[in-house]
UniProtKB/Swiss-Prot annotation:
EC category name: transferase
EC number: 2.1.1.-
Necessary cofactors: [4Fe-4S] cluster
Record Gene3D superfamilies: Cobalamin-binding domain, tm_1862 like domain
Keyword Lyase: no
Pfam families the record matches: B12-binding, Radical_SAM
Name listed for the protein in its UniProt record: Uncharacterized methyltransferase PH0819
Residues annotated to bind [4Fe-4S] cluster: 202, 206, 209
Keywords tagged on the record: 4Fe-4S, Iron, Iron-sulfur, Metal-binding, Methyltransferase, S-adenosyl-L-methionine, Transferase
Record-level Gene Ontology MF annotations: 4 iron, 4 sulfur cluster binding; cobalamin binding; metal ion binding; methyltransferase activity
Superkingdom of origin organism: Archaea
Family (UniProt): Belongs to the methyltransferase superfamily.
Length: 459
């Protein structure tokens, strides 16, 4: 077996939007992959965003490290940056094996390798075991046939191996290789910042989300002990004081959410944190425990004030449940962030205006407004394709602030104008500004400025 030199890359981006928005979190997926293969191979991770690297910098690193394998991850809007890294790697060494992973390529393996012939393979879905088997095969000179979850080139065509079954006991996955990341670069408003995924899988199937297809509909959670171990490493070894839990729904298993929160308190971990919750998986017991455990903000996917649009989304919630969840959060001293999506295919102006009004009516501290975006793999993508709604397949536009679908009742300019109106009308209210000065020390103003910059200076 050959010891492989493996370079894992989160590409830099040509867009300034990442720098405008502020917080950049560690590329957790790459750190998981590294943890799976580092015992037998030489692994290096490049975070092009956090380290503010140029493509020229990437080229120099590749030349110096001389990897056998280059693994790249990217969001949909950063795919062209990933392609650039792949081309750089192949130009330096045509024999290097280039592989990509992530939600976008999971659902577009043939298209990805057609758009960028420098990519040799795509890891689909949950990637740890597939990547480990790929590295093992390459190190031993074996063929790739039979590696579940892998798509690769064979005789000029793309061969898609069958999907890989999901990892049932996620505690078997090693703790991410945080030591290979530039942990000192991750800050949230100047505070050392980290991200943790305590569970995988989502039993829901919202029209705009591919999570249940990427990580399965069956929820799989880490043990409380494993979560505390990972938090302790981040806090004591890297000085992390602010955590974002990346679970789709941290509160899906209420008892476990309570247990994790109380253990954080019992262990004396001096961290504050945020987490996402559905409005119908949140109650007073959960809110109380989360607050006691150091949580300061809960992210709610409220999406719309229109029951008709909520039904189209497949959200499975009501506006009243959103009102109740926000009230519960506020009762226990938690800040609430509401996420809202406008611009679904046949959404009316009255429905969009009602959603903006609803956001202001709710007692939420922060609001995030986006335009409905049909990402590959989602039901919204399938709907847009079936109804010929796509305006572009320029992935750079898939930012959630650029309109990429034809809408029945709006032009692209009109829905963009409504997005700007949503941010301005929510944040530039006397009630919000006064509350911000006395309770949030200007944090809401900072968030509003970031949101508005995202909208006005689109990627």
């Amino acid at each position: 077996m050959k010891v492989m030199k493996i370079l894992l890359v989160l590409p830099p981006t040509e867009s300034a939007i990442k720098r405008v928005v502020g917080t950049t979190g560690p590329p957790l997926g790459l750190a998981y992959l590294a943890s799976m293969v580092r015992e037998e191979h030489d692994v290096k991770i490049i975070d092009g965003l956090a380290e503010d690297l140029t493509f020229s910098d990437i080229a120099k690193i590749i030349k110096k490290f001389d990897p056998d394998i280059v693994g790249i991850t990217a969001t949909t809007s950063a795919m062209y940056d990933a392609y650039t890294v792949a081309k750089i790697a192949k130009n330096i060494n045509e024999n290097v094996f280039v592989v990509m992973g992530g939600p976008h390529v999971t659902f577009t393996p043939e298209l990805t390798m057609r758009e960028c012939p420098c990519i040799d393979a795509v890891v689909r879905g949950e990637g740890e075991l597939t990547f480990k088997e790929l590295v093992d095969a390459l190190s031993k000179g074996r063929e790739l046939k039979g590696i579940l979850g892998l798509s690769y080139k064979e005789n000029g065509k793309v061969r898609n191996e069958p999907p890989r079954p999901l990892i049932q006991n996620v505690d078997e996955i090693p703790i991410p290789s945080y030591d290979l990341l530039p942990m000192d670069k991750y800050k949230a408003d100047g505070v050392p910042f980290g991200v943790v995924m305590t569970s995988r899988g989502c039993p829901f199937n919202c029209v705009f989300c591919s999570s249940s297809l990427q990580f399965g509909k069956r929820w799989r959670g880490h043990s409380v002990e494993r979560v505390i171990e990972e938090l302790s490493i981040l806090h004591y070894e890297y000085g992390i004081k602010e955590i974002e839990f990346l679970d789709d729904t941290f509160t899906l298993n209420k008892k476990r959410a309570i247990d994790i929160s109380l253990r954080i308190k019992q262990e004396g971990l001096d961290i504050s944190w945020t987490a996402s919750s559905r409005v119908n998986t949140f109650n007073e017991k959960v809110a109380k425990a989360m607050k006691e455990g150091g949580c300061h903000t809960v992210y709610f996917g409220i999406e719309s004030a229109s029951p008709r649009i909520l039904e189209f989304i497949g959200k499975g919630i009501t506006p009243q449940q959103s009102i109740d969840a926000v009230k519960t959060a506020k009762k226990f001293g938690l800040h609430a962030l509401g996420s809202f999506i406008i611009g679904f295919p046949d959404e009316t102006r009255e429905e969009v205006e009602a959603t903006i009004k609803f956001a202001k009516k709710l007692d939420i501290d922060y609001a995030q407004f986006t335009i409905a975006t049909p990402y590959p793999g989602t039901r919204l993508w399938e709907y847009a394709i079936a109804n010929n709604l796509l305006l572009t397949m320029n992935w750079r536009k898939y930012t959630t602030i650029d309109p990429v679908m034809k809408l029945k009742h709006f032009t692209s300019e009109q829905i963009s104008k409504l997005l700007r109106k949503a941010y301005i009308s929510f944040y530039l209210r006397p009630k919000v500004l006064i509350k911000d000065i006395f309770e949030h020390h200007g944090f809401i103003i900072k968030r509003a400025i970031r949101g508005l910059l995202r909208v006005y200076y689109q990627a």
